[in-house]
Amino acid sequence: MPGSPRPAPSWVLLLRLLALLRPPGLGEACSCAPAHPQQHICHSALVIRAKISSEKVVPASADPADTEKMLRYEIKQIKMFKGFEKVKDVQYIYTPFDSSLCGVKLEANSQKQYLLTGQVLSDGKVFIHLCNYIEPWEDLSLVQRESLNHHYHLNCGCQITTCYTVPCTISAPNECLWTDWLLERKLYGYQAQHYVCMKHVDGTCSWYRGHLPLRKEFVDIVQP
């Protein structure tokens, strides 16, 4: 219908949602809930390994009144781990230009490779932000790299709970306790780098590193 306002692209709506979700009082801060790498993989629509070829600042929409900007990264996709049913080959990824909206800064025109997780919007564009799991490929452990192919995907029925204080106990048989913050005061510590929360035939879940059971200090954390 002539004169009718055009609907906003899905990425513009997502930008507005990120702005609304910004915690009050944090100013320019970007705040994300903690998540284990396995949770990131399970909750992401797209998981790829890629290099960044170039970057460009682009408008968030075709509306001249819209002042929001996006960073568009042109990438060279090396391998896709998840998202085959949504997109075949990713050429561009988009992120908010504003860091307060969780925009991601990546190194372009370098040899650095990244593990990128993100969402595929209704218009087919791939959108990433700081609350996604985005890591230099060289920083991933061997267990993490191998788990991208199978173990993370096959165990999305397990629940991972972050432990902040003791005692910290499971509330369901399919739950694993993530204790990196308690033991190392950082999220992506030894447990995140070397263990997968795996489901057994009886429906229970527990941490495993390949065929090795969980280290004793991870088990002891559930005791008062």
From Swiss-Prot:
Main localization (coarse): secreted
Positions bound to Zn(2+): C30
Domain NTR: 30-156
Signal peptide start-end: 1-29
Site entry: Involved in metalloproteinase-binding: K69
GO biological process: negative regulation of membrane protein ectodomain proteolysis; Notch signaling pathway; response to cytokine; response to hormone
PROSITE patterns membership: NTR (PS50189), TIMP (PS00288)
KW Metal-binding (keyword) present: yes
Matches recorded under Pfam families: TIMP
Disulfide bonds: C30-C102, C32-C131, C42-C156, C158-C205, C163-C168, C176-C197
GO cellular component: extracellular matrix; extracellular space
Family the UniProt entry places it in: Belongs to the protease inhibitor I35 (TIMP) family.
Protein name per the record: Metalloproteinase inhibitor 4
Known role: Complexes with metalloproteinases (such as collagenases) and irreversibly inactivates them by binding to their catalytic zinc cofactor. Known to act on MMP-1, MMP-2, MMP-3, MMP-7 and MMP-9.
Organism: Homo sapiens
Span list, region Involved in metalloproteinase-binding: 30-33, 99-100
PANTHER family, A to Z: METALLOPROTEASE INHIBITOR, METALLOPROTEINASE INHIBITOR 4
Tissues in which the UniProt entry reports expression: Abundant in heart and present at low levels in many other tissues.
Keywords: Disulfide bond, Metal-binding, Metalloenzyme inhibitor, Metalloprotease inhibitor, Protease inhibitor, Secreted, Signal, Zinc
GO molecular function: metal ion binding; metalloendopeptidase inhibitor activity
Subcellular localization(s) per the UniProt record: Secreted
InterPro entries recorded: Netrin_domain (IPR001134), TIMP (IPR001820), TIMP-like_OB-fold (IPR008993), TIMP_C (IPR027465), TIMP_CS (IPR030490)
